[in-house]
Regions:
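Short Cys/His-based metal-binding microdomains
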Residues: 123
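Helix-hairpin-helix
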Residues: 94-118
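Generic structural signal for hydrophobic core residues of well-folded globular domains
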Residues: 74-82, 113-120, 133-136, 191, ...
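Long, highly charged, low-complexity intrinsically disordered interaction regions
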Residues: 2-99
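Non-catalytic, well-ordered alpha-helical scaffold segments
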Residues: 67-72, 111, 127, 200, ...
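C-terminal accessory module of base-excision DNA glycosylases/AP lyases that mediates lesion recognition
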Residues: 1-30, 126-132, 136-217
Length: 217
């Protein structure tokens, strides 16, 4: 994990020198949960603030409001509308340990739920984040490549990149289904500590740069 950590640190250093205009995920401020007010300015700052405020509100709310906040973050903010009612209820009500034990299944959704549990401890893991972590190792010609789970995507470029990854990664180290998320968090935390930043900034950078990294291979 040391090699990918050093690659990620260098990648972050280059991009954090800019004004962070690389993050373009816009928030529909017309459907924000009650009591949430976002700062003016860049999307990256708005999204960090949203995570922090949602976590604060979640931690002080009853189970009904907790569930509503998680559903907002998965469905409205995240745009994931494919979960059935039963699955969404599971994500809304179960503790972190049970969600993490799901492994790859539904990780793009349940990792969003975990951000509300604690935005400083947990981070989103989705197809773009995974793709960036894998492609950074290709670009930097890593000697000991670690395959982060390849997740389905609605984005054509990500889907094509995933097909290529499956072809070339047969000899990569495969992360166990019940361990990859904790290793991912460990990687983010060690990187964040070295850079004196937070794990949200690193996750958002990985999300934002996925298609750009694909184009470099």
């Amino acid at each position: 994990m040391e090699e990918i950590k050093n690659i990620l640190i260098d990648f972050c250093k280059v991009n954090f020198k800019t004004d962070c205009d690389w993050y373009h995920w816009e928030i529909n401020e017309d459907v924000l949960p009650k009591g949430i007010e976002l700062p003016k300015g860049k999307n990256v700052n708005k999204n960090v603030s949203l995570k922090e405020q949602l976590h604060s509100k979640w931690s002080q709310s009853d189970i009904k409001i907790k569930g509503e906040l998680i559903e907002y973050y998965i469905v409205q903010w995240g745009g994931i509308k494919s979960n059935n009612k039963e699955t969404l209820t599971f994500y809304k009500t179960k503790p972190a340990e049970e969600l993490i034990n799901l492994g790859v299944k539904g990780v793009s959704s349940w990792s969003k739920a975990l951000v509300l549990h604690d935005s400083n401890k947990y981070a989103i893991f989705d197809s773009r984040v995974s793709c960036s972590l894998n492609y950074l190792q290709i670009i930097n010609e890593s000697n000991n490549k670690i395959l982060f789970p390849i997740l389905p995507s609605r984005n054509n470029k990500i889907s094509s990149a995933n097909k290529y990854l499956k072809q070339i990664s047969k000899n990569w180290v495969k992360l166990k289904n019940d361990k990859f998320y904790e290793l991912y968090l460990s990687l983010l935390n060690e990187t964040a500590k070295d850079l004196n930043t937070n794990i949200s900034m690193i996750e958002m950078l990985l999300f934002a740069k996925a298609t750009e990294l694909i184009d470099k291979v």
